[in-house]
From Swiss-Prot:
Belongs to the methylthiotransferase family. MiaB subfamily. It is found in: Cytoplasm. It comes from Mycolicibacterium paratuberculosis (strain ATCC BAA-968 / K-10) (Mycobacterium paratuberculosis). This is tRNA-2-methylthio-N(6)-dimethylallyladenosine synthase. It comes from the Bacteria. PROSITE patterns: MTTASE_N, MTTASE_RADICAL, RADICAL_SAM, TRAM. Catalyzes the methylthiolation of N6-(dimethylallyl)adenosine (i(6)A), leading to the formation of 2-methylthio-N6-(dimethylallyl)adenosine (ms(2)i(6)A) at position 37 in tRNAs that read codons beginning with uridine. Transmembrane segments: none annotated. The lineage of its organism: Bacteria, Bacillati, Actinomycetota, Actinomycetes, Mycobacteriales. Its cofactor is [4Fe-4S] cluster. [4Fe-4S] cluster 2 binds at C183, C187, C190. PANTHER family: CDK5 REGULATORY SUBUNIT-ASSOCIATED PROTEIN 1 (PTHR43020), MITOCHONDRIAL TRNA METHYLTHIOTRANSFERASE CDK5RAP1 (PTHR43020:SF2). Pfam families: Radical_SAM, UPF0004.
Length: 517
């Protein structure tokens, strides 16, 4: 669906405004991409940046307030994401009036949901595009400029797998790799399946080709992305045969055979799809990190049933027990929702009990957000805000104490860190650098000026807090890497997908490396 809207005076702001649009010194139009939401959106934003650079735009200078083109890649999971977007759009309205050549585009899940309503709430927006057609952005910008009319284009199904598009990667040392898009589950609180569509999987050959290309550019760590990664393979399975649930485990093992790939992570698995062969692949593949992020959402079986989460608390805890039996030092994290409609104090107590038993390294805890269009929004028993807030605070307090105890147990241990940038907000004040341990924990450490983001160091943990570790005893070893060289030189892997000509069964050559059925 494509619509054009006339460019009358649509801004509610009047009067002269001095433009601060960041035009490149060479006259090239500049861009910014502002991202809300999950890792999938972060990776999609790399694709949007790659598309714009391929079309001749240049990223605005660091610290520039605005650019010639500002793209919002949005989230629709929580109400505060809506409010934040429309608030930021309002802040840009006077700048837009001061420079009519400036363009504003809104994409992602909220755009897929709101469609033309984006223009009704923010009529100074130039382009609205959805989750299925991010490759259309440069064309839509040009069409809006030429026609002097806003363009709304929302596709109802995936037009082109995002990983086949150009990419401007944010990191020289770590990369996202999509293995699937969409979701076949029907959780009552979640709007994502209606916005991202049914699950569509890439073939193993295409995924491994992209990973090899990234490693050739110096990348040390990849994170395999999907709404439900351990359902991988469902879209190219033969419906006439029994479901083969081993495709994701084989993909992990195949990543283990790629020389130069030091770390493999993945997010997020669904407990109902979690099989023992994935645990075995994690434990037996040296470069697969001992880290698991698996959403629990609630510890109450009654609430899980109302959420349409097709597992129960004991099954979830059983998976954790088997993971820890295979990898005793694995860091396990989760997502939790407080205040789902109908949640009683007894239900909440069940969640607290599971959290105590699970001993998560960390938990991303959310207050239930009522989303129009989801079954949960129509349920009776919506919980008063004050009750939700009180339960939320109790849960956070419990989890923070568990996280602190787990981190304190690591004091004195030696860890390997992949040095990162942007992870430590106080690094400049504390003269520390930051990095991630193999289990995903954040460590702030004392280093000298020879250590660069992208390098690997070992150090000893000397202190702990709920959300990070401290290593002030100095660096024990330092390995300079090609990723560190690339970061120092300002180079990023381009990461163009190496062939996503179709979504479907893997080609024949995948079988020898363990990914074909």
């Amino acid at each position: 669906m494509t619509c054009g809207f006339s460019r009358a005076d649509r801004s509610p702001y009047h009067g002269p405004v001095t433009s601060t649009v960041a035009r490149d010194v060479s006259g090239v139009r500049t861009y910014q991409v502002r991202t809300y939401g999950c890792q999938m959106n972060v990776h999609d934003s790399e694709r949007l940046a790659g598309l714009l650079e391929a079309a001749g735009y240049r990223r605005a200078a660091e610290g520039a307030e605005v650019a010639d083109v500002v793209v919002f890649n949005t989230c629709a999971v929580r109400e505060n994401a809506d409010n934040k977007l429309y608030g930021n759009l309002s802040h840009l309205a006077p700048r837009k009036r001061g420079n009519p050549e400036m363009q504003i585009a809104v994409g992602g899940c909220l755009a897929q949901k709101d469609r033309e309503a984006v223009l009704r709430r923010a009529p100074w927006v130039d382009v609205v595009f959805g989750t299925h057609n991010i490759g259309s952005l440069p064309t839509l910008l040009e069409r809006a400029r030429h026609n002097k009319a806003a363009q709304v284009e929302i596709a109802e199904a995936l037009q082109q797998f995002p990983s086949s598009l150009p990419s401007a990667r944010e990191s020289a040392y770590a990369a996202w790799v999509s293995i699937s898009v969409g979701c076949n589950n029907s959780c009552t609180f979640c709007i994502v399946p209606s916005l991202r569509g049914k699950e569509v999987d890439r073939s193993p050959d295409d995924i491994l080709a992209e990973v090899r290309s990234l490693v050739a550019d110096g990348v040390l760590e990849v994170t395999l992305l999907g709404q439900n990664v351990n359902a991988y393979g469902v879209s190219f399975a033969d419906p006439a045969l029994p479901r083969d649930r081993g495709a994701f485990a084989r993909l992990l093992r195949a990543c283990g055979e790629i020389d130069g790939l030091e770390r493999v992570r993945f997010t997020s698995p669904h407990p109902a799809e979690f099989t023992d062969d994935v645990i075995e692949a994690m434990a037996q593949t040296p470069n697969v990190c001992p880290a698991l992020h698996m959403p629990l959402q609630s510890g109450s079986d009654r609430v899980l049933r109302a959420m349409r989460r097709s597992y129960r608390a004991e099954r979830f805890l059983g998976i954790i027990d088997r993971v820890r039996a295979a990898m005793p030092h694995a860091a396990i994290t989760t997502d939790l929702i407080v205040g789902f409609p109908g949640e009683t104090e007894e239900d909440f107590a069940a969640t607290l009990d599971v959290v105590r038993r699970a001993r998560f390294a960390a938990a991303f805890t959310f207050q239930y957000s009522k989303r129009p269009g989801t079954p949960a929004a129509e349920l009776d028993g919506q919980i008063p805000k004050a009750v939700v807030q009180e339960r939320y605070e109790r849960l956070v307090e419990l989890q923070e104490s568990i996280s602190l105890q787990g981190n304190q147990a690591l004091v004195g241990q030696t860890v390997e860190l992949l040095v990162a940038t942007g992870e430590g907000r106080k690094d400049s004040a504390t003269a520390r650098m930051s990095g991630r341990a193999r289990d995903g924990r954040l460590v702030h450490f004392a280093a000298d000026d020879r250590v660069r983001p992208g390098d690997l160091v070992t150090t000893v943990i000397t202190g702990a807090a709920p959300h990070h570790l401290i290593a002030d005893a100095g660096v024990l070893s330092h390995r300079r890497t090609r990723a560190g060289d690339a970061h120092a030189a300002g180079r990023r892997p381009r990461g163009v997908g190496l062939g996503m000509p179709a979504v479907g069964p893997p080609a024949g050559p995948a079988q020898p490396v363990g990914c074909a059925s």
